[in-house]
From Swiss-Prot:
<protein>
    <recommendedName>
        <fullName>tRNA-uridine aminocarboxypropyltransferase 1</fullName>
        <ecNumber>2.5.1.25</ecNumber>
    </recommendedName>
</protein>
<dbReference type="InterPro" id="IPR005636">
    <property type="entry name" value="DTW"/>
</dbReference>
<keyword id="KW-0539">Nucleus</keyword>
<dbReference type="GO" id="GO:0016432">
    <property type="term" value="F:tRNA-uridine aminocarboxypropyltransferase activity"/>
</dbReference>
<feature type="region of interest" description="Disordered">
    <location>
        <begin position="1"/>
        <end position="29"/>
    </location>
</feature>
<feature type="region of interest" description="Disordered">
    <location>
        <begin position="165"/>
        <end position="193"/>
    </location>
</feature>
<comment type="similarity">
    <text>Belongs to the TDD superfamily. DTWD1 family.</text>
</comment>
<keyword id="KW-0808">Transferase</keyword>
<keyword id="KW-0949">S-adenosyl-L-methionine</keyword>
<feature type="short sequence motif" description="DXTW">
    <location>
        <begin position="206"/>
        <end position="209"/>
    </location>
</feature>
<dbReference type="GO" id="GO:0006400">
    <property type="term" value="P:tRNA modification"/>
</dbReference>
<comment type="function">
    <text>Catalyzes the formation of 3-(3-amino-3-carboxypropyl)uridine (acp3U) at position 20 in the D-loop of several cytoplasmic tRNAs (acp3U(20)).</text>
</comment>
<dbReference type="Pfam" id="PF03942">
    <property type="entry name" value="DTW"/>
</dbReference>
<dbReference type="InterPro" id="IPR051521">
    <property type="entry name" value="tRNA_Mod/Golgi_Maint"/>
</dbReference>
<keyword id="KW-0819">tRNA processing</keyword>
<feature type="compositionally biased region" description="Basic and acidic residues">
    <location>
        <begin position="180"/>
        <end position="193"/>
    </location>
</feature>
<dbReference type="GO" id="GO:0005634">
    <property type="term" value="C:nucleus"/>
</dbReference>
């Protein structure tokens, strides 16, 4: 579970055949009945059929699961891969999962299933190397030093300028002999400082609140700019008792960060491009909501 704030836009009827634009009023308060009703989603008929037929075997590990295998991050046998939407993201997503987080209860796997080319999941203490990249990587996590998404570009620019000043202070090294710093993806510090701020990667923590500080305070993440989603509220069915409704599940945090980034940083009108990140989440939300509404006992083992 990620710990950042957010509300949920909403999903359209008739399997969301038409994309409904999310209006500001829909993203700043929770709809009382269905906060996910206006999302622009692919057909969920494949999930309805899978839910009716019951658990199926994972094609890779053979485990019995509902909808997807949370261990292998793949759909199970009765959910054809070609019927699962694939979402293209503008940023790379790294999810740091606490080793004690229960895989079957985490929504982090939703992101990997739906945006496999952009999402990586690491189990703590395994954390990617971010040293020297704090001007293009942010951590989504609430705290006293956290900023809003609207201020991300400003603070990244300040970090770039700081690096530029440090470079200029190195008077003993001729500019042509300064070391060019690159990584396997072609990352180049000197090129990026010339081009201005560009966010490339976002880090999320997948953990219960009581376990998050161990990861957030890790020295490998300590220097990253912290971003908080302050206007969003969760509708997660496993919301932690006693915690504010601005603490989101992991998939909610990823989704709302991208929606806000699209509008506030890229300055483009949001038209549902990332709504399918909630493809599994919205379906499971309704299953549990309907079960509770009809007096049935909601099944916590839905995907376990």
């Amino acid at each position: 579970m990620a710990l950042s704030p957010s509300v949920v836009p909403q999903e359209s009827k008739e399997d969301n055949a038409n994309c409904v634009e999310t209006k500001p009023s829909q993203t700043t308060s929770i709809a009382s009945e269905d906060p996910l009703q206006n999302l622009c989603l692919a057909s969920q008929e494949v999930l309805r059929k899978a839910q009716q037929s019951g658990r199926s075997r994972c094609r890779q590990c053979g485990g019995s699961r509902m909808f997807y295998c949370y261990t292998c991050c793949v759909p199970v046998g009765n959910v054809p891969t070609e019927q699962i939407p694939c979402v293209q993201l503008p940023l790379k997503i790294d999810i740091i999962k606490h080793p004690n987080e229960t895989d079957g209860k985490s929504t982090a796997v939703h992101a990997k299933l739906l945006a496999p080319d952009s999402v990586n999941i690491y189990t703590y203490p395994c954390i990617p190397e971010y040293e020297g990249k704090d001007h293009e990587v942010v951590l989504v996590f609430p705290g006293p030093q956290s900023i809003s998404i609207e201020d991300v570009s400003f603070h990244l620019q300040k970090r770039i300028e700081s690096k530029g000043r440090n470079k200029a202070d190195n008077l003993d090294v001729p500019p042509r002999k300064l070391k060019r710093t690159t990584d396997e993806e072609g990352w180049d510090l000197h090129e990026s400082t010339r081009q201005g701020p560009e966010l490339k990667r976002v880090v999320f923590i997948d953990s219960t609140w009581s376990q998050t500080n161990q990861i957030a305070s890790d020295e490998r993440l300590r220097e990253l700019l912290q971003v908080e989603l302050r206007t969003r509220k969760t509708c997660f069915w496993r919301h932690q008792k006693g915690k504010p409704d601005t603490f989101l599940s992991t998939i909610e945090a990823i989704y709302y960060f991208l929606v806000d980034y699209h509008s506030a940083v890229q300055k483009e009108k949001y038209r549902g491009q990332y709504d399918n990140l909630l493809f599994f989440y919205s379906f499971m939300y309704r299953l549990i909501k309907n079960a509770r509404g009809s007096g049935e006992k909601a099944k916590p083992q839905l995907v376990q």
